[in-house]
């Protein structure tokens, strides 16, 4: 803290510098060139409030780097503290002086806010008396050491930086200024440099080049670095006392840019520049845009298109827009994390870049001199209206150059020095004198004024301006308010200029305009004839009249010869304002109507789509309901059919197709039951026959063996029997295969029952034919056996094939019981075949016994038996 106390030493006294509080606060000052809140370290004592870039007690001291005091204010016991809790703002007010002082700071937290408030109240209570303090200025000094520590200070009045806008492009002698030469150099040598105006140069080189220009090196050579010269242009624009485009002009450009139609937007931008821009500001903006347009036209070489160039130069040209002085109609609310401020700053930067981009892309259309209508104030017209005495005075002024103008400005600068330095932190110090200097040069120099080529365009009417002056006889304003009127509302720049001419003309005609300063009342005596002239323009009263009229503090009352007031000027201004408002309202109404039409069309399309969707869904629901009802009816019918027994179903509520299927199912069930009963009976009969004939067959074999051993002739019979038995086996296999094929054929065709019965007759006839080959006698006897007789044996117990086919033909083959019926048919066919073969074998055995039995076998009683089938 010793370092802090050492830094607080001031040469004005040895009063106690007790530290009441120290800590960080946020400071914002447009006068210092800051566009946002910056955090600084503040130290509060009984006599002053100073701030540093960092905490002087903890900052490590590097070699040669000193944490100097960046600024501060002197305190006295007349100050007061005002707190705004919603934004955590802390304002220190001083009613002393002619204008008063106000300093606004911002705390990080509410706790810091109230701590600083308490400390400031204590310090102000112990501060020196305001009447005893002599020569205080109480202004936050410029932060000269923020960019470069320890660099040399420039002269108080630089030849390059800090010059008024009127002298930005031309010097007093009419020669090109530093800025104009730099612009010409960039247009000549910088168009092919990649990244020109975007790539930054060394700050020290830029400062060195400015100092060299001030020291005599006033020309730019081809071997200089274009990036350094480009940064010199930015440096000069940044150090201008006021923005090249004021706040009201930025607002006009912003409103014109928001128009959707391109042609209307260009026309509105042209009108905004012609109507709201003062002539020096318009010429400066047009010159800089011309250089930027030249660079962007070579974008294929330098890679700087209009958008890129606008991004680099927009913050320098539209400073009020980025500083938040223009209404962007955004809804960003301040928050604790400053996110809303960041969003608002980004929105402002985007709008500024977009406006400059449009001005570059349509440069030829917007800055067409034939289309620009501006208020022209020329010294030639003033000389013509003033008479020969004014001409002599103007000639005297031209001979002396701007010496008289400087002399007239100098008292204002000296007189208002303290007030200029004691302005609010949100205003630029030193701006008032420079603006007045701009005005003097603007009025006296014919080279800076271009007469409009359109003779029908609007011109300044001295009568209208005088009326406006006369109707405001009592105007109490300070230098700060006057600076705001000229700097922030350039729409009145031409009005004030015309008022200056009117004031001078009235002074020359002998009219007494006693212009008050700082709240004095105004006396307006009767006006003499305009033909009476007064040549003394160099008197102090004349100087004060000019200055007061320019700043808006002077006023007069124009009275006609009959004593009445002329209100035509006020009515004309009111009509213009109403016309402007009407046009704006029409544009807004048209915009809203277009938006409503789009929304209405979108709503109709959505309504139609929803209606179509509704109809489609209704159709789907109806179709599905019908399908569901049909499925339910079918299910009920099937359940009824399954639950009923055969032959007992009711036809009520059942369609013909379902009824036919149910009848078919009932018949199939009856057939299956009957066939099952038949199979059971056949199995029972077969078992009985096997048991009955098994013993007879064994006796027959013994008899044949006996005959073979005793009778040689029986060997032949035995051989014939064996061949017959083999033939029977072969025939059995063949019949089995035929039955299988017949069953398959019946399943596929559902017919052919008669063919099967007929096909068996040749097979039955082949049996006697095969026996004829062995013995002619046996053949003769066996040939007498009729096939019908063989087939008639045991006919009551054996169903014919045709009967079986008739039974199996009844049910449909595609019914689920068709497979069971086919199996039963095959089984029945096999049983018939076995019975027939058994009958044939029994007949053959009987014939053999009769023919070859002899006397020894007469007593033998043959008992037929079934052969042992393998």
Curated annotation (Swiss-Prot):
Residues 378-432, 446-465, 736-793 are annotated as: Disordered. Residues 777-787 have a biased composition (Basic and acidic residues). CDD domains: PH, RhoGAP. GO terms for molecular function: GTPase activator activity. Transmembrane segments: none annotated. Pfam families: Lzipper-MIP1, PH, RhoGAP. Residues 569-693 form a coiled coil. Residues 407-417 have a biased composition (Acidic residues). Residues 167-367 form the Rho-GAP domain. It comes from the Eukaryota. Residues 18-125 form the PH domain. The record marks 198 as: Arginine finger. GO terms for cellular component: chloroplast thylakoid membrane; cytoplasm; plasma membrane. Keywords: Coiled coil, GTPase activation. One of its GO terms (biological process) is signal transduction. SMART domains: PH, RhoGAP. Acts as a GTPase activator for the Rac-type GTPase by converting it to an inactive GDP-bound state. PANTHER family: RHO GTPASE-ACTIVATING PROTEIN 7. This is Rho GTPase-activating protein 7. It comes from Arabidopsis thaliana. The gene is ROPGAP7.
